[in-house]
């Protein structure tokens, strides 16, 4: 928070001063904070600050090509002189990555080029495309829960989810609770969503390397992407 001068700041009656609040690109993906202005008469004025500090990858894979999800555990194996073996896990959760191809035409091609130019090295909100569900009923703006059975899907409390219509029409929401075939949200939805809207769990992830864009025509391009999760992805010891 930048103020025009040194604190404490004197204000005359009806005087206007501009305070500049800057949010950096580095830090937790979800911004949830309060700035409090304290006045000499004991009054306080609170400013709610919320939002997201990341972009979403909103273009689905090219489903004519395989999508590969990889889980990588790390275990230390020690063999004693007597021949006994001791295995010690070195990771609480496996490293998780996804690799898939995309095919983009016209508007989608422009979106891919701009998104990669602007955000390649930073953290993305990556949908887990294979766990997609569709809304069975309209979702009003300001909704605080989504009716969906999340059993066996990658929705997690504290993680993000995406409501999706197309590459430019989507909304990221934060999951607060999962129970009784409903997902409770930490903040209300900002717009209404019709029946058939896709709902996907998201994980924060980074591109492992800069993709090489292949142009097939002046409108059509393709590339291969590999993302690695930046958040812990707890995994059950057995398949659900």
Language-model features and meaning:
Residues 40-108:
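N-terminal intrinsically disordered, low-complexity, charge/repeat-rich segments that act as generic
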């Amino acid at each position: 928070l930048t103020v025009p001068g040194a604190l404490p700041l004197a204000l005359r009656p009806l005087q206007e001063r501009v305070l500049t609040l800057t949010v950096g690109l580095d830090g937790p993906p979800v911004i949830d904070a309060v700035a409090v202005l304290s006045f000499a008469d004991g009054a306080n004025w609170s400013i709610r600050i919320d939002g997201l500090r990341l972009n979403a990858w909103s273009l689905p894979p090219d489903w004519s090509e395989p999508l590969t999800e990889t889980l990588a555990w790390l275990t230390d194996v020690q063999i004693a002189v007597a021949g006994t073996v001791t295995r010690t896990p070195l990771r609480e959760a496996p490293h998780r990555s996804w690799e898939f191809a995309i095919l983009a035409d016209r508007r989608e091609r422009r979106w891919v080029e701009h998104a990669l130019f602007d955000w390649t090295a930073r953290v993305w909100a990556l949908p887990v495309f294979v766990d997609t569900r569709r809304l069975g009923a309209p979702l009003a703006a300001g909704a605080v829960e989504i009716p969906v059975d999340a059993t066996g899907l990658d929705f997690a409390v504290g993680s993000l989810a995406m409501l999706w219509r197309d590459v430019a029409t989507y909304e990221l929401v934060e999951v607060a609770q999962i129970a009784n075939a409903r997902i409770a949200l930490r903040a209300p939805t900002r717009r209404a969503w019709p029946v058939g809207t896709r709902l996907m769990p998201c994980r924060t992830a980074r591109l492992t390397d800069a993709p090489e864009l292949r142009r097939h025509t002046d409108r059509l391009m393709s590339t291969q992407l590999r993302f690695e999760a930046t958040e812990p992805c707890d995994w059950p010891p057995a398949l659900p």
